[in-house]
Amino acid sequence: MIHPLLQTYGPLDGWMILLIMATVSIGFFSYQVQKATRLVLIGSPDSRFDSWGPRIREFIVGWLGQKKVLRDRIAGTMHVLMFWGFLMLASDMFDLATANYFSSELLPGFIVGPWNGMVELGYTMALIGCVSAFVRRVAFTPEKLKGKSQLEGNVILILIFTITTTSFMIESKEDPSPFWEPIGHQFNQFGLSVNTVVVAYWLHMLAISVFLFLIPLSKHMHLVMAVPNVFFHDIGPVAKMRPLAVGDDGKAVPLEDLDIDSFGVSSYTQYTWRQLIDAWSCTSCGRCQDVCPAYASGKGLNPMQVIHDVRDYANEHAPLLLSGETPKETMMQRITEEAVWACTTCNACVDVCPLYIEHVPKLTDLRRNAMMETMEYPDVLNTAMGNLESTSNPYGYGEHERADWAADLDVKIGEPAEYIYFVGCAASFDERNQKVARSTISLLKEAGLDVGILGMQEGCSGDPARRAGNEYLFQMLAETNMMTFQELGVKRIIASCPHCFHTLGKEYADYGGEELEVFHHTEILAKLQEEGRLPRVEKNGQSITFHDPCYLGRIGGIIDEPRDVIGGVDVEAERSGRDSFCCGAGGAQMWMEEESDKRVNEIRAKELSETGCDTVAVGCPFCSIMVKDGLDAVGSEMDVKDVAEILWEQIVAKDNEIQEKVAKVN
């Protein structure tokens, strides 16, 4: 057979036709990619050129290994088949375009068989993946795809189907090996005519050309942008927020030395270049919207739409942006205030995204600008922010009342100790959560730990202020707490609030707290049980489930320890562990009014009540409040107790039992 490139089609030779197709398609593709690249590079600087070893390892696992893609078993498997298939067959594109045109062979003879076998395997995997995906879309449409246009996705699948099937037809005329290329060999047995194969060849090349046209105009731009997006994703502590400014020593610039023209993000170019790559990396898979508590409760936030908004803004204002001008439309106007202030910062969207898109920082950066520059933030936050500034707690109680809950406990207050129990605002002032603080300190003393509390010297960790966007107030609180830690020589901290645990343990490192060892109380309690210094929980017929707080499980990575403390759970909630559903209090939502027909905590409470357990164990003061309110709202009589309460109640009950027995003997 004369290769299609060497044939003449009217006035043009085959190679001339291919040259025209390649020039047009590759030229258009290249233009669109460089335009998107320019729109990315006008972003602000970002220090993502560190830790090359970890980045390379993460890239291999995350991009090549498709680690996060496979968390959705069905859709993930289909995607992996197409992804790995295309990786193996990409090299064949050049071969098909040049075979029999160049006189020299590119591969040694002994490699040809295995190479062709690998290429055929790649086409086969891609074919299976695309057919499976098409059937799923048509016959078993996922809920998130219902009611949405699937034209773009279906066209891409048809193109992949065309590319793969025509490759087998072309292969059939190249004397395929029955061992290395069984499918091509089978097509060879069909006896396809020369004209059929020639048509297949040009359909193959046409499909590739159309594919190149569509990639930069669709969500499939992720085929290009995913590579830098995954490689340069944040490999630091999960959900750690950046300081306003970082000095040469890598630490946050002190408040008195700050010299900043603008706070947070108002315009497109104030986002960093890494944040902007996200905009062209989104595949519109919908995983982020599926796990978003704000979206689930009917609020105006869809994390996927936030990413689309950034990309659409860039494309619509490209001439102005690329000429160095700033469009009148702000990013807050495009993304909307409702979306920005609905976020609970639970990080579920970031955690589940297969391409490591960072949704939450885009919203918190907008909050920073609204809170510290334009002053256009929800009025309801004024009370909490004012209280934090004047009394170092969002409730507005006096500092002298912080340790009232411990008045009858023999505990060090404001004195050096091996461990400092950082009580947190909720456990200091909320009557319900004061029981948690009493249980925790009693357990630690029971185990013989040298532990103390800061009392009136303790201030809020600053989490509510920082997540609300008031970075200035957060830094004031952080610097004040760090001064206290340094004065008392604090090295080890125990926190029962996951928000304090995260902020003190991960974010205070930028303010001189890099040597602090911060533990969640469930970690310490589990360790003390393992050492035999505290007893194991005996449930005595009581059934327990556990609600994983976002900042403890998904963000903090502490999943097993709370369960160990309570002797395991009897029934897991529908969403648990790393995939737990938010209670609705994070991201400063605790201090805002939830305005929607469905409430986040009620959605979660319903899931927990469906376990049929007697008790919901928690490990967060905010979760304790929100879950209890949610259970009351859905008519459930389940108890809500912190793991420390469950363990301490058992110890007290046993002591009472012993005392009763002694009394009877006497």
Positions of PLM-derived features:
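Juxtamembrane inter-helical linkers in multi-pass membrane proteins
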Residues: V40-W63, K144-N154, E181-F187, V224-L255, ...
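Hydrophobic alpha-helical membrane-insertion segments
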Residues: V80-A90, V155-D175
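Ferredoxin-type iron-sulfur electron-transfer modules and their immediate structural context
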Residues: L212-A342, T391
